[in-house]
């Protein structure tokens, strides 16, 4: 187990009241959180989203990506379901950090795609560690999930880490002229399942 559960509090949102649960990485002290809606106990698979931190999309309303749109849609789907979990995975910029993400954006402004920009900065296309998310699910006593994602790699890694992903639920929202190239690159180079028609 790479994490410990350290704090929780109620979080009222436009979609309803969630329980915010804070986790801390034992080795580094880095923090992550889960938003839990309703009663997630029992044997029925839980609707869930693993949402990686994106300050620009989630808080600054960037149109360069689909992250903020996905965050809002996921919270709405979970509330409609009546129960579910959103894991907020604090690995900004596919885990290259905010400042490197800004540098990657500058390279994209010069014509690189999102994968090429990461490579030019010396990073892999995706540096995230989703095994941390498997630990969060385990600490919430969730072992069967209907995962809101377009990323089959997330499904594979979570399954390998002991979380049974019984269904991949598509979450295709937020397409706009500013992020068409970004989404096309995620589909072509990172294997994301997106209807690009």
From Swiss-Prot:
GO cellular component, one term: cytosol
E.C. number: 3.5.4.25
Active site, UniProt feature: 126, 128
Binding locations of Zn(2+): 54, 65, 67
Cofactor: Zn(2+)
Superkingdom, natural source: Bacteria
GO molecular function: GTP binding; GTP cyclohydrolase II activity; zinc ion binding
Record-annotated disulphide pairs: none
The protein's assembly and partners: Homodimer.
Name of the protein in its database record: GTP cyclohydrolase-2
Organism: Pectobacterium atrosepticum (strain SCRI 1043 / ATCC BAA-672) (Erwinia carotovora subsp. atroseptica)
Lineage summary: Bacteria, Pseudomonadati, Pseudomonadota, Gammaproteobacteria, Enterobacterales
